[in-house]
C-alpha cells in the first residue's frame, strides 16, 4: 500500500485521494483547519461539490434580509406577531436585546477559538474512534463515510445529559463557557416557547408532558470554517434544515450563512448579515411537524471563504429522544387535516445522521402520503 500524503508542503494538485484526505484530516485529527494551515494552493478532490450543489453569487437575493426583532418587549402583541410571522414566512429571524449577556457570547467565541487552536493530537482525543463517550465528538464535514463530496468544516459536537457527564467528558478548554451559555439561554428558550407555541399555536400550556416533547434535550456544536483555496468548488455546510425544535445560532462577524427564500422560484438565497450582539433563531423540522406545517424549517447553507476563517456556535433545542413528533391537537382542532404522521424523535434523528445533507428530504419521513 502506498504511503498516505502528509500535506506537509503547499503542493496539491486537486487529485488527492479519499485515503489521503481521511488519514490526514480524520485519523490524525488535523481537520480541514490543518489543510488550510498547510497553505495548500488547490482544494483536494474529495471536497469538490457536484456542479448542481455549488453556490453562485447570482443566486443571492440582493437587498434582502431575514427579519430583525427586538426582544426587549418580548410578550407585547407587536413582538409576538413579528416572531410568529417570521416563523411562518421565513423560518429564520435575528434577535437583539435577547437577554443573553453579551460578555457570555464573547466568551463562547473565545473558547471556540481556543478549542480549535489545540494541537491535532489533543483534538483527536474526541474523535469518533477515540472519544470515551458518544455524546462528545470532534470531526470534519458531516457524515464523511457516506458523502460523495466532503464539506469544508471542522466541528465539536456535545450532547448535554447531565452536569456530572459534562464535567467529566466535555473538553475543559471550552466546557465552562458552553455551560454558562446554555444556562444563560434558558430564559430565552422559555420565552420563545411561550410566543411560538402558547400564543402562536394556541396550545393551552406547556406541561410536564409537552415540555420534554418540545425542549427536552440540548446539543451544542462548535463549528470552524477555515479559509479555503478554492471556495467556489466546495461548501462549508450543504443544503439542509435542522431537525431541532428550533436552533439558536451565534456567529462571528465574517458571514457566510445563506437562507433559502420562500418564493416562486425556490432557488434564491438571502445572506444573513452578522449583527453584533445578535442571535439567529431558526425553526427546526420538529416544530414544523408539531405546527402541522404552519411554521417552516428552511433550507440553509454555509459558503466557504477564500480569505478568512469563520466560527459559529449553534445551540440545538431538541425534543427528548423518546418523544413522539406529531401535530398538536390544538392545531388540528378546527378540522385541519394532519400533514404529518407520528414519528419517534430518535428515529427521525437517526435518519438525519445516516445520510449526507440533502435539503428538506428528511421531513419526508414524517409526511402522510
Curated annotation (Swiss-Prot):
Positions that bind Fe cation: 240, 242, 300
Purpose: 2-oxoglutarate (OG)- and Fe(II)-dependent dioxygenase (2OGD) involved in scopoletin and umbelliferone biosynthesis. Converts feruloyl CoA into 6'-hydroxyferuloyl CoA, and p-coumaroyl CoA into 2,4-dihydroxycinnamoyl-CoA.
Binding site for 2-oxoglutarate: 225, 310, 312
Pfam families assigned to the protein according to its UniProt record, in alphabetical order: 2OG-FeII_Oxy, DIOX_N
InterPro entries: DIOX_N (IPR026992), IPNS-like_FE2OG_OXY (IPR044861), IPNS-like_sf (IPR027443), Oxoglu/Fe-dep_dioxygenase_dom (IPR005123)
A GO MF term: metal ion binding
Family indicated by similarity: Belongs to the iron/ascorbate-dependent oxidoreductase family.
Annotated protein name in UniProt: Bi-functional coumaroyl CoA and feruloyl CoA ortho-hydroxylase Diox1
Top EC group: oxidoreductase
PANTHER family on file: FERULOYL COA ORTHO-HYDROXYLASE 1-RELATED, OXIDOREDUCTASE, 2OG-FE II OXYGENASE FAMILY PROTEIN
Alphabetic keyword roster: Dioxygenase, Iron, Metal-binding, Oxidoreductase
Enzyme Commission (EC) number: 1.14.11.61, 1.14.11.62
Residue span(s) of domain Fe2OG dioxygenase: 209-319
Pathway terms, separated by semicolons: Phenylpropanoid metabolism
Cofactor: L-ascorbate; Fe(2+)
Natural source organism: Ruta graveolens
Entry note: cofactor: Binds 1 Fe(2+) ion per subunit.
